Design a protein with these regions (language model features):
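Conserved ABC ATPase signature
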Residues: 132-136, 140
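ABC ATPase C-loop
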Residues: 149-150
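Conserved ABC transporter NBD signature motif
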Residues: 59-67, 79, 111-114, 120
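Conserved structural motif at the start of ABC-family nucleotide-binding domains
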Residues: 5-7, 20
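Helical segment within the ABC ATPase nucleotide-binding domain
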Residues: 172-186
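The feature captures the beta-strand-to-loop junction immediately N-terminal to the Walker
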Residues: 36-38
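Helix-to-loop junction immediately C-terminal to a conserved catalytic motif
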Residues: 51
């Protein structure tokens, strides 16, 4: 199931402003790769480039043997890129069940079901299946957003700040879920995060960004280095 995701020398502009400068990231198969940095350095723009929401002006993104530069978001999703956006973006008026079923869009009829392991990872989703998404707490909505992405059967799971504004107990649940997906499902995971302890605990590889550029990459243990942390201090 593991598939590599390779970002090679991409540039991205918003009008005349350059947001990303020659960004290169390799997400090795079956590993968790974390991208860190202060607010506004281009982390989320990088993820939106991967998913096709933002269009790059130079470089290439490859997913296994497929090149993605011209592929629209729906095609990337069908190839196996699952996305959990910042802010969760669940549908508040739909039930938990209906929110999960929105992940069916790109699936064949035979695959249109919610894999049992999603409810094992996030039992609250099963117990609140018929409740509206808007009734869930922020942490529960994040679990729902991750569950919805997993319904699409991704080979690579991309998450934008999955711990933002969430209580510590649910952060631990999310961390355990991502480790399960890596260790038991062989999933490749790319996440943007500012919570250093979370990344130190679950990430295999890190990339540190500043002003739209990669300043450092290496193992998660490098987060203890002073020259790395200087790019993360507010």
């Amino acid at each position: 199931m593991s598939t590599a995701l390779t970002i090679s020398n991409i540039d991205l502009h918003y009008g005349a402003a350059q947001a990303l400068k020659r960004i290169s990231i390799t997400c090795a198969p079956g590993r968790i790769t974390a991208v860190l940095g202060r607010n506004g350095v281009g982390k989320s723009s990088t993820l939106r480039a991967v998913t096709g929401i933002n269009h790059i002006s130079a470089g290439e993104i490859a997913f296994g043997s497929d090149t993605l530069r011209k592929a629209p978001p729906y095609k990337r999703a069908r190839l196996g890129i699952g996305y959990v956006p910042q802010g969760r973006e669940i549908f508040p008026l739909l039930t938990v069940k209906e929110n999960l079923e929105t992940g069916y869009a790109g699936l064949s009829r035979g695959d249109r079901n919610v894999p049992a392991y999603i409810f094992e990872l996030f039992p609250v989703l099963k117990s609140m299946l018929n409740r509206r998404g808007g009734d869930l707490s922020g942490g529960q909505q994040q679990q729902l957003a991750i569950g919805r992405a997993l319904v699409t059967r991704p080979k690579v799971l991309v998450l934008d700040e999955p711990t933002e504004g969430i209580q510590p107990s649910i952060i631990k649940d999310i961390g355990r879920a991502l480790q399960f997906l890596r260790d038991e499902k062989g999933m490749t995971i790319l996440l943007v995060e500012q919570y250093l302890d979370f990344c130190r605990e679950i990430a295999d590889d890190i990339y540190v960004m500043d002003r739209g550029e990669i300043m450092h990459n290496g193992p998660a243990a490098d987060l203890d280095r002073a020259d790395v942390r200087q790019h993360l201090m507010v």
